[in-house]
Amino acid sequence: MTTTKRPIALLILDGWGYRENTHMNAIFHAKTPVLDRLNAQYPHGLISGSGLDVGLPDGQMGNSEVGHINLGSGRIVYQELTRISKAISDHEFETNPALCDAVDSAINAGGAVHIMGLLSPGGVHSHEEHIEAMCRMAVARGATKVYLHAFLDGRDTPPRSAKASLSHFDDLFTTLGHGRVASIIGRYFAMDRDNRWDRVSQAYELITQGKAKFQYDNAVTALEAAYARDENDEFVSSSAITDVDGKVATLQDGDALIFMNFRADRARQITRSFIHPDFDGFERAVVPKMHFVTLTEYAGDITAPIAYPSENLVNTLGEVLQNRGRTQLRISETEKYAHVTFFFNGGKEEPFEGEDRILINSPKVATYDLQPEMSSTELTDKLVAAIESTKYDVIICNYPNGDMVGHTGNFDAAVKACEAVDTCIGRVVEALAKVGGECIITADHGNAEQMTDETTGQAHTAHTSELVPFIFVGRDATIDKGGKLSDVAPTILQLIGETIPAEMKGKPLIHIKE
């Protein structure tokens, strides 16, 4: 057997895809001398991070949560989007016990069924087809008061694309004979994940008190007014929608509130504001005693009923390393810290034995195009120190820049973001060379390689379905073609001389030349 090297570092360049078309391709236009040199010098290829290869529907773009679950578990994990869509088409959804209990409790109390979530066909945090199924199910079970609190996207969808969704739901409620859109607000407020409670509080007050910056009698009118104020979907101010009598619909005691987002990271904060008795993120004027249900599992400390609990993943990379007595480090900025820990560990919150974690605070700026380098220098300082300490067998690091700046739609800033990451990789590779370590450089999904929508000409702020890079900076080796994210964990185990558990269905991609 070949002697192994340590540490092996996995560098995940978030939102860094490969695209032939160079138009508005921030990765192509960025000056990346380090990656250019590594590509010229070391074995490299492209692997898949989207669609069926990561357990999403065919053609569906990848995302960070899905990417890290596949990277860390070494198998294709069928995602909540796919699971729930299947439950709807199989008619299992309409008899889901947690959802039925919520609707029935509201009906029996003479209350309303409130449904909140990201109203979007994006499929990253939610899918509007799931929200539609929930509205239909509530009415079918006898609910006459059904209120939709719509969070608007513009990030995993074009920046101004919510009108079609809102119009569709207006028509749906007309057809059903009950229900209406009760409020709209941008995801920037409702779905913050960086403890910016001043944002979340606006969504909370909108739903619980009808307290809004604006009030309209129709959701589409509210959206058009937001566009006139130059607010894209993501940033739409809190807008309450009144009924024919000019009344707003607020969450009351005895009501049910069903949160239809299936992705956890941006659902946690607002959920805690609704259900934690000792919540202190902001002052809550009212705390309705209601029946709260989450579509999926958001966090260990969130004890609400769950419609679709997580599937238990055993023998993920982290667990195998623990069981074999290996040491590991997880490191990233705030924005992607959950991804290299919770998601990489298959949805487990607690660190494994021998697993250290380093969290670097992301900069407190309104949007990351204002600071495209983010906290990459500080992150790299800590990463280099960890490498040089020779304390770890395996290091998992995520650089968020390509994704977080890619989401702003600002091409020049995205170029700077890529250049900042390239500089950091240079320092990491140098540190690894010093201690005889190796690294794999890859990504979880694409984003920054496409900064404009070729059809509409609007900024492209969403992820892509492009292949992502896979570079091995280490011993002389060959790389298999046609790999996917789930092949990365088995590859790492093979490189450090550990056997691959049966649960990992991925295949090692790197073959060291003897």
Curated annotation (Swiss-Prot):
The keyword Manganese is annotated on this UniProt entry: yes
One Pfam family linked to the record: Metalloenzyme
Catalytic reactions on record: (2R)-2-phosphoglycerate = (2R)-3-phosphoglycerate
EC number from the UniProt entry: 5.4.2.12
Residue sites binding Mn(2+) 1 per the record: 403, 407, 463
Enzyme class: isomerase
Binding-site list for substrate: 125, 155-156, 187, 193, 263-266, 336
Gene3D superfamilies listed in its UniProt record: Alkaline Phosphatase, subunit A, BPG-independent phosphoglycerate mutase, domain B
Free-text comment on the cofactor: Binds 2 manganese ions per subunit.
Keywords of the record: Glycolysis, Isomerase, Manganese, Metal-binding
Subunit structure: Monomer.
Family of the protein in this entry: Belongs to the BPG-independent phosphoglycerate mutase family.
NCBIfam families: pgm_bpd_ind, PRK05434.1-5
Function (record text): Catalyzes the interconversion of 2-phosphoglycerate and 3-phosphoglycerate.
UniProt name for this protein: 2,3-bisphosphoglycerate-independent phosphoglycerate mutase
Organism of derivation: Shewanella sp. (strain W3-18-1)
Gene, per the UniProt record: gpmI
